[in-house]
């Protein structure tokens, strides 16, 4: 089971499949496909936007693993969540389908609060301080919660 499948399953159990959205590709115009988020949990005016990063080609070198963490978790994943927030602002409605197969249109007009979470599964040689990192502060989007797969 991939990290994305695991989180979709876990969120489906915790938040019910009606509120969990794991298939979030949308096309704002022909030929342009984007992903809103790896996983989205949506309750009316509140949403949790999640990006998931899994280390597939781990090494035994802790500095290589630290570099992966900095580039993929702190860099790419937080950038992708910033894209999620931008997509919601730029598009009046984005059509998404929940884990029950029901489709909805979501837009920033109805969202008053969005929690930003990055879930990561690093390699065995990932340094302990990376595993213990629980937040990231963005200059433009505030704080992001970081959760290692080991605690969920």
Give names to the regions the model predicted:
Residues 1-152:
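Intrinsically disordered, low-complexity Ser/Thr/Pro/Gly-rich regulatory segments
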């Amino acid at each position: 089971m991939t990290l994305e499948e695991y989180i979709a399953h876990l969120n489906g159990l915790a938040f019910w499949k009606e509120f969990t959205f794991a298939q979030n590709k949308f096309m704002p115009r022909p030929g342009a496909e984007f992903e809103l988020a790896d996983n989205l949990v949506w309750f009316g005016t509140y949403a949790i936007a999640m990006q998931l990063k899994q280390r597939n080609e781990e090494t035994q070198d802790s500095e290589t693993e630290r570099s992966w963490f900095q580039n993929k978790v702190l860099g790419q994943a937080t950038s992708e969540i910033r894209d999620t927030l931008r997509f919601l602002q730029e598009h009046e409605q984005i059509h998404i389908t929940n884990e029950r197969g029901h489709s909805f249109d979501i837009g920033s007009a109805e969202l008053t609060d969005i929690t930003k979470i990055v879930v990561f599964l690093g390699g065995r040689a990932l340094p302990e301080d990376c595993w213990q990192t629980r937040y990231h502060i963005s200059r433009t989007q505030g704080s992001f919660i970081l959760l290692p797969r080991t605690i969920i």
